[in-house]
């Protein structure tokens, strides 16, 4: 089917070819004018330090590997724009699609189209929840760190530092995202029975929103002596730290965050944060290699987990002093 369409494309009008090139897409059949394999990257777009580092790393890795990658970011977690970009890549008959989804559901129809067109899909960072059996066939592999592991590390830090139990809060990302669910699952897997979460609220990955939410929670639960805040990303943790400082509680409330950006590590060194769990964004090479291997007919692992680490103040200072952080 794809070969037949490619033959038709070779006799298409020059105007049509110019139109396709102008919108940054591939020619029918999957190969660009340069002869490179074409890849469509359905991306989240601007969303903080992790996202910027991750998406730049993926783009660079595919360029270095000799692919013709088209980057299509959305804005404000707009899933409909992502779906439109995904479907356009299918219609353009790219050789592969990289999907970093804003939502974990709602992808069945698009993935089914990709499966029918025999276009392999590689999910990165966030998993998608697919019900349709045909749609599932499109997904070759998932590449990214383990969000469950990150949540488990947060719980184990609280358990270790509060063996007699503690009260605290959880600041979550936007509702419905697999990353939010998985980090919450990890927390639940490991947290001790004498650790009480007074309330969980979404602060939508935002520093400003987290500052406001945390200030309200600290006031609401003042009599419960909150001792920890688990923020599901660095930006929210930094906002929580501002609220804790404003309330005169710096050093009395431990703040745990996930991502491992330079700003968070510096805040850890400065004593504003207590523990930072890395969610390693640098896996462009692994993603490009998985796509290349699959297109070359090789077997690819279904779940390619990227290793991450944890930081206390000492290891954060070492990482910053050595300038080893890419984000």
Curated annotation (Swiss-Prot):
Pfam families assigned to the protein according to its UniProt record, in alphabetical order: Peripla_BP_4
Compartmental location: Cell membrane
This protein's GO CC annotations: plasma membrane
Major place of residence: membrane
Induction, as annotated: Induced specifically and reversibly by fructose both in a time- and dose-dependent manner. Also induced by ribose or xylose, but not by glucose.
GO molecular function, one term: carbohydrate binding
Changes seen on gene knockout: Mutant is unable to grow on fructose as sole carbon source.
Residues lipid-modified (S-diacylglycerol cysteine): 23
Matches recorded under InterPro entries: Peripla_BP_I (IPR028082), SBP_2_dom (IPR025997)
Endpoints of the signal sequence: 1-22
Keyword line: Cell membrane, Lipoprotein, Membrane, Palmitate, Signal, Sugar transport, Transport
Membrane topology label: Lipid-anchor
Tree of life domain: Bacteria
Lipidation (N-palmitoyl cysteine): 23
Protein task: Part of the high-affinity ABC transporter complex FruEKFG involved in fructose uptake. Can also transport ribose and xylose, with lower affinity. Binds fructose, ribose and xylose, with fructose as the preferred substrate.
Subunit annotation: The complex is composed of an ATP-binding protein (FruK), two transmembrane proteins (FruF and FruG) and a solute-binding protein (FruE).
Family of the protein in this entry: Belongs to the bacterial solute-binding protein 2 family.
Protein name according to UniProt: Fructose import binding protein FruE
């Amino acid at each position: 089917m794809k070969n037949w369409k490619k033959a038709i494309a070779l006799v298409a009008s020059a105007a049509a070819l110019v139109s396709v090139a102008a919108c940054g897409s591939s020619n029918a059949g999957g190969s660009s004018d340069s002869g490179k394999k074409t890849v469509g990257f359905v991306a989240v777009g601007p969303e903080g330090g992790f996202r910027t580092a991750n998406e730049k790393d993926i783009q660079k890795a595919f360029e270095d590997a000799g692919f013709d990658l088209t980057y299509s970011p959305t804005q404000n977690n707009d899933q409909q724009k992502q779906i439109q970009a995904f479907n356009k890549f299918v219609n353009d008959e790219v050789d592969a699609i990289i999907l970093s989804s804003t939502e974990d559901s709602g992808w069945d129809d698009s993935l089914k189209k990709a499966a029918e067109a025999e276009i392999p899909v590689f999910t990165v960072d966030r998993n998608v929840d697919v019900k349709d059996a045909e749609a599932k066939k499109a997904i070759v592999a998932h590449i990214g760190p383990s969000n469950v592991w990150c949540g488990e590390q947060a719980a184990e830090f609280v358990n270790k530092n509060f063996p007699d139990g503690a009260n605290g809060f959880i600041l979550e990302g936007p509702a419905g995202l697999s990353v939010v669910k998985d980090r919450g699952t990890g927390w639940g897997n490991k947290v001790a029975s004498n650790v009480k979460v007074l309330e969980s609220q979404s602060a939508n990955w935002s520093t400003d929103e987290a500052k406001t939410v945390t200030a309200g929670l600290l006031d609401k639960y003042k009599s419960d002596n909150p001792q920890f805040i688990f923020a599901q990303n660095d930006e929210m943790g930094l906002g929580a730290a501002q609220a804790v400082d404003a309330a005169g509680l710096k050093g009395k409330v431990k703040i745990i965050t996930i991502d491992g950006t330079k700003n968070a590590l510096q805040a850890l060194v400065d004593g504003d944060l207590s523990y930072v769990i890395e969610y390693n964004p640098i896996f462009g090479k692994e993603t490009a290699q998985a796509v290349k291997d699959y297109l070359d007919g090789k077997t690819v692992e279904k779940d390619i987990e990227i290793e991450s680490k944890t930081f206390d103040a000492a290891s954060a200072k070492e990482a910053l002093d050595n300038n080893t952080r890419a984000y």
